[in-house]
C-alpha cells in the first residue's frame, strides 16, 4: 500500500517542496529550509499543511458518554465551539495517543470532532466503534480523515492574516475555541489552537476546498514543512506521539509525560483506576539544555554528573531560535527539578546539561 497524500500534495510539488514519510503519509519536510521556515513562524507567520492528522466525528445521543470514556479530560465541560487537549489511554493508564477534542459548533457536522495523530485514525476509529458496540451506546463514529484537509497558520501575524480573509470574528476566538467561518468561499472550522507556542489558528475544511484555502493564505506567508513544525514544538516542549511516548516502545502515563492537567479522574475514562496512584511518577518529562558542544538525540542516555544513568532523551535539536542544543526526555523524579545539573551521553562521552523547564524561549 502506497503512502497517503494530502489534498494539497499537488500544490506542494508545484512549490518545490522536499517530502518525507511520516505516519504513512508523504508530507512536505520543507519548502525553503527549516531555519527560514522556523524563523518566519517566530517572527511573522507560516502556514503548515497538517492534513496528515486524523479527524474522527462522533455524534448521537450517547456521543458525550463515548468521548468521556475514551479520552482523559472532561468533555462535559465543553460548550459547542469549545475544545480541549486530552490523552487516550489503555486499561493500564498508558498513553496510546494524545488528541484535541472539539465539541463542534451547531453549524458543523457531528457533535464531537477529535484529532488523532498521523497514522492513528484507523486505530482510533476501531477503538471507538469497538467500545461503542461493547457497551451498547447509541452513537455514530465516522473516520472523515480523507474527507477533510487541515492547515495551521502560526506566528505573531497569523491572527491578522487569517482575519483579513475570514473576518474579525477570528480575533474573538479565545484559546481552545472554534467557530465555523468562511475562508475563500469555503466553509471551515477555525480554531484558536496550535503546536508552535505562537499565536495562530488551525483550520479544517472539506478536501475539495483545500486549494482555495491554501492559496488564499499561503500566497502571503511562508509555507512550512514538518521539519520546522518539529523544531518549533520542541522549543515549546510539546509532546510528539511515537517519539516522546509510545505504548510499545516507550510506554508512559499522562503524569509521567507532564500532562496531568489533561486528566479528569471524575470523568471515568478507561485507565482511570490504573492511574489513581500514579500522580507522583518515578520519572518525569523534562527539558534539557546542553552546556557543551553536541546535540541530544532520541535514545541518548541522561546521567548524573557521576555517570549513573537516570533517564533517556526522546527528542533533541539545535534550537534555531536560541542557537543552542536543547532536548526533551525523561529522568528520575529525584533529578527533575529545574536547574539540576545532569549529563547527556553522546557517543560514549558525557556532556554536561541542565534540566530546563520548557518552554525554552522567553515569551
UniProtKB/Swiss-Prot annotation:
One GO term describing the cellular component: glycine cleavage complex
KW Transferase (keyword) present: yes
Assigned EC number: 2.1.2.10
Gene Ontology molecular function: aminomethyltransferase activity; transaminase activity
Pfam family, one: GCV_T
Record keywords, A-Z: Aminotransferase, Transferase
Membrane-spanning intervals of the chain: none
Keyword flag Transferase: yes
GO biological process, alphabetically ordered: glycine decarboxylation via glycine cleavage system
Enzyme superclass (EC): transferase
Reactions listed under catalytic activity: N(6)-[(R)-S(8)-aminomethyldihydrolipoyl]-L-lysyl-[protein] + (6S)-5,6,7,8-tetrahydrofolate = N(6)-[(R)-dihydrolipoyl]-L-lysyl-[protein] + (6R)-5,10-methylene-5,6,7,8-tetrahydrofolate + NH4(+)
Quaternary context: The glycine cleavage system is composed of four proteins: P, T, L and H.
Family annotation (NCBIfam families): gcvT, PRK00389.1
Family of the protein in this entry: Belongs to the GcvT family.
Function as written in the Swiss-Prot or TrEMBL entry: The glycine cleavage system catalyzes the degradation of glycine.
Protein's UniProt name: Probable aminomethyltransferase
Organism per entry: Halobacterium salinarum (strain ATCC 700922 / JCM 11081 / NRC-1) (Halobacterium halobium)
Lineage: Archaea, Methanobacteriati, Methanobacteriota, Stenosarchaea group, Halobacteria
The gene coding this protein: gcvT
Amino acid at each position: 500500500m502506497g503512502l497517503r497524500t494530502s489534498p494539497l500534495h499537488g500544490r506542494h510539488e508545484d512549490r518545490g517542496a522536499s517530502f518525507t514519510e511520516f505516519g504513512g503519509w508523504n508530507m512536505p519536510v520543507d519548502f525553503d529550509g527549516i531555519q527560514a521556515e522556523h524563523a518566519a513562524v517566530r517572527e511573522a507567520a507560516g502556514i503548515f499543511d497538517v492534513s496528515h492528522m486524523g479527524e474522527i466525528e462522533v455524534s448521537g445521543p450517547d456521543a458525550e458518554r463515548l468521548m468521556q470514556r475514551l479520552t482523559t479530560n472532561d468533555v462535559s465541560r465543553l460548550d459547542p465551539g469549545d475544545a480541549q487537549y486530552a490523552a487516550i489511554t489503555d486499561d493500564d493508564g498508558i498513553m496510546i495517543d494524545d488528541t484535541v477534542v472539539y465539541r463542534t459548533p451547531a453549524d458543523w457536522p457531528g457533535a464531537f470532532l477529535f484529532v488523532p495523530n498521523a497514522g492513528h485514525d484507523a486505530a482510533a476509529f476501531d477503538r471507538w466503534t469497538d467500545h461503542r458496540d461493547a457497551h451498547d451506546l447509541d452513537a455514530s463514529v465516522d473516520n472523515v480523515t480523507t474527507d477533510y484537509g487541515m492547515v495551521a497558520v502560526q506566528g505573531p501575524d497569523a491572527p491578522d492574516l487569517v482575519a483579513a480573509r475570514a473576518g474579525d470574528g477570528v480575533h474573538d476566538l479565545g484559546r481552545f475555541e472554534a467557530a465555523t467561518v468562511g475562508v475563500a468561499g469555503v466553509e471551515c472550522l477555525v480554531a484558536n489552537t496550535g503546536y508552535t507556542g505562537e499565536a495562530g489558528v488551525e483550520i479544517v475544511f472539506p478536501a475539495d476546498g483545500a486549494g482555495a484555502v491554501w492559496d488564499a493564505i499561503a500566497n502571503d506567508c511562508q509555507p512550512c514543512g514538518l521539519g520546522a513544525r518539529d523544531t518549533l514544538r520542541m522549543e515549546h516542549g510539546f509532546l510528539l506521539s511515537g517519539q516522546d511516548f509510545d505504548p510499545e516502545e516507550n510506554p508512559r502515563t499522562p503524569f509521567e509525560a507532564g500532562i496531568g492537567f489533561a486528566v479528569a479522574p471524575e470523568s471515568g475514562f478507561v485507565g482511570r483506576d490504573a492511574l489513581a496512584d500514579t500522580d507522583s511518577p518515578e520519572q518525569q518529562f523534562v527539558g534539557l539544555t546542553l552546556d557543551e558542544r553536541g546535540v541530544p538525540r532520541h535514545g541518548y542516555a541522561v546521567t548524573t554528573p557521576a555517570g549513573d544513568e537516570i533517564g533517556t532523551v526522546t527528542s533533541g535539536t539545535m534550537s534555531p531560535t536560541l542557537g543552542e542544543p536543547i532536548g526533551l526526555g525523561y529522568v528520575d523524579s529525584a533529578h527533575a527539578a529545574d536547574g539540576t545539573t545532569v549529563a547527556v551521553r553522546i557517543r560514549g562521552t558525557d556532556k554536561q546539561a541542565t534540566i530546563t523547564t520548557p518552554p525554552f524561549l522567553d515569551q
